[in-house]
């Protein structure tokens, strides 16, 4: 009898961990290096259960100090596994007018009031060499 109770408890613990791992947040940048004034695309991608609700970060005109947002595309939603899962992609077009190495901290996405974070990114901005 005790073995059955222990087995049931273990099944509940394992199923809770499986459900908790069903959300992934990933961030990518298409160019690690750009020249001043060039543009790069930052992509924030969330994979989750179709019944969950996602709230993406609300940026206005800057991603971080020195990195300006040129455009925020509409989120692209794809349904997977017979509409059981969703993949939502949000794309930000960014630029910079100062040469530096910019650290883009992890971006947070709220899924059913719980925050999940992406990995941090870096963007190196070079100045144009002057011809003499």
What do these predicted ranges mean?
Residues 4-14:
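Sec-dependent N-terminal signal peptides
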């Amino acid at each position: 009898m005790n073995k059955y109770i222990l087995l049931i408890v273990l099944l509940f613990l394992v199923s809770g961990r499986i459900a908790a791992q069903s959300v992934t947040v990933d961030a990518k940048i298409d160019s690690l290096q750009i020249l001043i004034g060039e543009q790069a695309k930052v992509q924030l991608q969330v994979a989750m259960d179709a019944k969950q609700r996602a709230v993406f970060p609300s940026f206005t005109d800057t991603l971080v100090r020195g990195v300006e947002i040129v455009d925020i595309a509409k989120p692209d939603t794809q349904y997977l596994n017979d509409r059981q899962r969703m993949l939502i992609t949000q794309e930000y077009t960014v630029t910079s007018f100062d040469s530096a190495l910019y650290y883009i901290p992890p971006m947070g996405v709220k899924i059913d009031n719980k925050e999940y974070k992406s990995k941090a990114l870096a963007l190196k901005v070079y100045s144009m060499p002057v011809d003499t």
